[in-house]
Amino acid sequence: MSDLSIRSARPKDLPAIARFAAELVRFHHAIDPDRFLCVDGLEKGYERYLSGELRSEGVVLLAAEENEKLCGYVYARIEPRNWNDLLESCGKIHDIYVDPSVRRSGVGRRLLERAIHDLEALGAPRVVLLTAAQNESAQRLFGSFGFRTTMLEMTREAGKPPQKME
């Protein structure tokens, strides 16, 4: 990983980042297809959405690049006060993805470290994120940075019998 760089994303990075984002959606959908959406045109939709975000204030969109090839990204932004979530304005990490070929080599750690730094530089008094309950490796990474569990989302599907809690 000596040639790894973490940098601000550029417009030319968006097709690769959109592919990564689509893979992240598919990963979550595979975990729980009732909870996580998966629609046609994910790549184009993400490319269009992130193109607008790239030009927005308070957005952190970073690319991990090794040997001139993208191998991960993180998307975060400063979010305003949210009364529904009882949350003051904060930095929120929405996506972090590392290509499977370079996982467990420090790319995710470097992306997360830089995203936190950039959000704090933008004035975030705290950084929050969500992670799938089943994604234990991500939870360990986030925990190593001092993230703690503050909420637990629970979902119930209409018309389905209750499942026993473990």
Predicted regions and their residues:
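A conserved beta-turn-beta hairpin within the catalytic core of GNAT-like acetyltransferases
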Residues: 80-93, 103, 150
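Conserved active-site alpha-helix within GNAT-family acetyltransferase domains
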Residues: 109, 133-151
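Conserved GNAT-fold acetyl-CoA-binding loop/helix
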Residues: 22-49
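Conserved acetyl-CoA pyrophosphate-binding loop and the N-cap/start of the following alpha-helix
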Residues: 102, 106-114
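Conserved GNAT acetyl-CoA-binding A-motif
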Residues: 120-130
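A short helix-loop-beta-strand connector motif used in the catalytic cores of GNAT acetyltransferases and
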Residues: 48-62, 92
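Conserved N-terminal entry element of GNAT/NAT acetyltransferase domains
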Residues: 1-15, 160-166
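Conserved beta-strand in the GNAT
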Residues: 63, 69-78, 92, 97
